[in-house]
């Protein structure tokens, strides 16, 4: 018996169709939007857990804290930090760029820190601080935005 190459009907190689592109662009691949959503979601969660860790540390090492509250704050800080790094690494794996993931985590952390600071400690932020948050949000929007290719770039292809 001669064992010849067996081909299944489902597997078609790219060599059979030499004029077809080998791979679609990343934005057109199956599940690209879903991956992008989960990347952003994980990065937002990482920022929130980072802010929660900072709030727990402030609670644990405050000026008038008993030993039980201090231990509880340290455990909460360690747990929130480990969750933050877990979500950040998952966000990096889903994200198309580490810059996008880093800026998303930073924005989420700053915003959640402001909210937790107001809710837990009654802290209010200055208008200049909110202006900085707005500029970070503008930069984040520009990073997440995908510009269409220019006429010159499309002509070269």
Curated annotation (Swiss-Prot):
For membrane topology, the record states:
Multi-pass membrane protein
Question: Per the record, GO CC terms?
Answer: membrane
Cell compartments where the protein resides: Membrane
State if Transcription is listed as a keyword: no
Q: Which domain of life is it from?
A: Eukaryota
Q: Keyword Transmembrane helix, does the record have it?
A: yes
The UniProt transmembrane annotation reads 37-57, 67-87, 100-120, 124-144
Sorted keywords for this record are: Membrane, Transmembrane, Transmembrane helix
Identification of the protein by name: Transmembrane protein 42
The record lists the organism as Mus musculus
Which gene is annotated as encoding this protein in its UniProt record? Tmem42
């Amino acid at each position: 018996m001669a064992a010849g190459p067996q081909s299944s009907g489902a597997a078609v190689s790219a060599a059979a169709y030499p004029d077809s592109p080998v791979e679609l662009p990343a934005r057109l691949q199956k599940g690209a939007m879903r991956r992008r959503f989960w990347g952003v979601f994980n990065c937002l969660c990482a920022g929130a857990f980072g802010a929660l860790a900072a709030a727990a540390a402030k609670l644990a090492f405050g000026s008038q804290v008993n030993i039980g509250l201090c231990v509880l704050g340290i455990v909460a800080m360690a747990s929130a930090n480990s969750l933050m790094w877990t979500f950040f690494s998952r966000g990096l794996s889903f994200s198309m760029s580490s810059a996008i993931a880093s800026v998303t985590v930073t924005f989420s952390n700053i915003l959640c820190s402001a909210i937790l600071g107001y809710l837990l400690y009654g802290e209010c932020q200055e208008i200049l601080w909110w202006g900085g948050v707005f500029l970070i949000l503008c930069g984040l929007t520009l990073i997440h935005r995908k510009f269409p290719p220019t006429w010159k770039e499309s002509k070269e292809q």
